Swiss-Prot record:
Protein name, entry field: Pyrimidine/purine nucleoside phosphorylase
Gene Ontology CC annotations of this record: cytosol
Function: Catalyzes the phosphorolysis of diverse nucleosides, yielding D-ribose 1-phosphate and the respective free bases. Can use uridine, adenosine, guanosine, cytidine, thymidine, inosine and xanthosine as substrates. Also catalyzes the reverse reactions.
Pfam families: Ppnp (PF06865)
Species in which this protein is naturally found: Thiobacillus denitrificans (strain ATCC 25259 / T1)
Gene: ppnP
GO-annotated molecular function: guanosine phosphorylase activity; purine-nucleoside phosphorylase activity; thymidine phosphorylase activity; uridine phosphorylase activity
Catalyses which reaction(s): a purine D-ribonucleoside + phosphate = a purine nucleobase + alpha-D-ribose 1-phosphate; adenosine + phosphate = alpha-D-ribose 1-phosphate + adenine; cytidine + phosphate = cytosine + alpha-D-ribose 1-phosphate; guanosine + phosphate = alpha-D-ribose 1-phosphate + guanine
PANTHER family in UniProt: PYRIMIDINE/PURINE NUCLEOSIDE PHOSPHORYLASE (PTHR36540), PYRIMIDINE_PURINE NUCLEOSIDE PHOSPHORYLASE (PTHR36540:SF1)
Length: 104
């Protein structure tokens, strides 16, 4: 799916890590929320409250989940899951990484 229809978008951006990650919250009619964003080349650590599925829209990244030793690579069309109350490191090396974060 390349677009979301019939949604509400929060106009104020979520800006993290001095602008290296910028996203907007999208709310659906059923109350579910997602964020749509971009991560610029960097290595960042994110903490989760709810479980998340990170869908790669464009670009590529490497990810290391909390408690794991190996980095895994993801490209457009792939996704990875992060448990609730956890964290993950993400490395974006070249092109900006475009994503949709599915919560819950």
């Amino acid at each position: 799916m390349s677009r979301f229809d019939n949604v509400a978008v929060t106009k104020q951006a979520n800006v993290y890590f001095d602008g290296k990650c910028v996203s907007h919250t999208v709310e659906f009619a059923d109350g579910t929320k997602k964020s749509v964003g971009v991560i610029l080349p960097s290595t960042l650590t994110f903490n989760t409250g709810a479980p998340e599925v990170m869908e790669t829209v464009a670009g590529a990244c490497r990810v290391k989940l909390a408690g794991e030793n190996e980095w895994k690579s993801y490209a457009a069309g792939q996704s990875f899951e992060v448990p609730a109350n956890s964290s993950f490191e993400i490395e974006v090396a070249a092109e900006p990484y475009h994503y949709v974060c599915h919560f819950g």
